[in-house]
Amino acid sequence: MIIVEVTGGLGNQMFQYALYRRLQLLGKDVKLDLSFYHTKQTLRKFELGIFNLPLQVADQREICRLKGYTNDASRIQKAFTTRIYKHPCIYTEDLDKGYQDMVLQKDSVYLSGYWQNECYFKEIRNRILEDFTFPQEVTDRKQDMVRQMKGSNSVSVHVRRGDYLQSGNAGIYGGICTLTYYRKAMD
């Protein structure tokens, strides 16, 4: 069995799902680990549910078995020892290496990473585009909102939060999402 860890916001979830879907279409026994969203370490929510996707979710027993945990004590021990020795059933994406074809060859592994490289899913691009199509259901509330937007000079502002807000990441993202940036966008 392969388990793909899902973390982060919607964009990261979409890349992780794309790898999951590719592995699934390769005939692999693959499931998703959504446990990140059940902890207190994040305010983020699992958002892929808006697409009504075919998801197989791993239960805690399957996750623990693949990661080599049997109880809380072994979990603590593994957390300490994996800093020194890599666990053979856990593969953490090495961002410096880029695309790693061997990820698609594995059969029994826990995959942790963002997988933000189209090579992981470009062969199933059309399927992914299909999967990420919003449902066509139009509620009264949505119709009312469309009428309001058409009847006025509408503007949408998206404020990036999370990783962009952390001062240590300013250099990575080029400082593009500063308070000044948002003020200029709204002027």
Functional labels for PLM-detected ranges:
Residues 1-45:
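N-terminal pre-catalytic "stem/leader" segment of glycosyltransferase-like enzymes
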